[in-house]
Amino acid sequence: MSESDRLFAQPQQRVADFVFNEDVVRVFPDMIKRSVPGYPTIVENIGVLGAQFAQPNSVLYDLGCSLGAVTQSLRRHVRNDGCRVIGVDNSHAMIERCSEYLHAQDAMYQELLPVELIEADILALDLQPTSLVAMNFTLQFVAPDQRLGLLRRIRQALLPGGALILSEKLRFADAQEHALLTDLHIAFKRANGYSELEIAQKRSALENVMLPDTFEEHRERLLAAGFSRVSQWFQCLNFASMIALP
């Protein structure tokens, strides 16, 4: 069971860049629930939507799988014969805890898809032919100049009829819209018990690590990577999820 997120509750003389280490892993489920509006809806529906694109005897990828929430959702919803999920994350602590969570899921459910967990940098990963790739709040942590190359490799690996489901925090080209949705997101975090100090220090920790794009930038990049259609299927405040088709 996860702990309550208090990582930024005490004043820090110097706020270090955010990393997905053991401290974050311990509180991650609580952190994500209290920080990302709509997160449970996104995760559950990646499984629902993913089942529409998953093909028999194919690989499904969860790139940047963290604790495996999307992997678990895919295992619950996809029923195609011969499918398996590959979860990939570069954090050793995340992969270890994810494995524990998946073993717990195996104890509760029968006939779930098999899973392989890989500790690796997704930028260096050799992708197998795949009918579905999920990246749930992962691309925003990839260096901007490496995002197009990664998406091109994903597009090349996708089977005909497959899909990429991409969830990201958004920024907005219109300054007033960006300010409004940023303020509303801060209000969401306040309502979930975060103090002004916690909000400010976490923002400082993330500002050089997580670099969001606008939806228009995502769409243009996905089209440049070879995708034919990009549709946004969900948005709550400044968090969104989209489907890109080959």
Curated annotation (Swiss-Prot):
Catalyzed reactions: prephenate + S-adenosyl-L-methionine = carboxy-S-adenosyl-L-methionine + 3-phenylpyruvate + H2O
Residues that coordinate or bind S-adenosyl-L-methionine: Y39, G64, C65, S66, D89, N90, D121, I122, N136, R203
Any one GO molecular function term: S-adenosyl-L-methionine binding
A Pfam family the protein falls into: Methyltransf_25
E.C. no: 2.1.3.-
Keywords, alphabetical: S-adenosyl-L-methionine, Transferase
Single biological process term from Gene Ontology: tRNA wobble uridine modification
Enzyme class (EC, first level): transferase
NCBIfam families for this protein: carboxy-S-adenosyl-L-methionine synthase CmoA, PRK15451.1
HAMAP family registered for this protein in UniProt: Cx_SAM_synthase
SUBUNIT field: Homodimer.
Xref: PANTHER family: CARBOXY-S-ADENOSYL-L-METHIONINE SYNTHASE, TRANS-ACONITATE 2-METHYLTRANSFERASE-RELATED
Function according to Swiss-Prot or TrEMBL: Catalyzes the conversion of S-adenosyl-L-methionine (SAM) to carboxy-S-adenosyl-L-methionine (Cx-SAM).
Family: Belongs to the class I-like SAM-binding methyltransferase superfamily. Cx-SAM synthase family.
Protein's UniProt name: Carboxy-S-adenosyl-L-methionine synthase
Biological source species: Pseudomonas aeruginosa (strain ATCC 15692 / DSM 22644 / CIP 104116 / JCM 14847 / LMG 12228 / 1C / PRS 101 / PAO1)
Taxonomic classification: Bacteria, Pseudomonadati, Pseudomonadota, Gammaproteobacteria, Pseudomonadales
UniProt gene name: cmoA
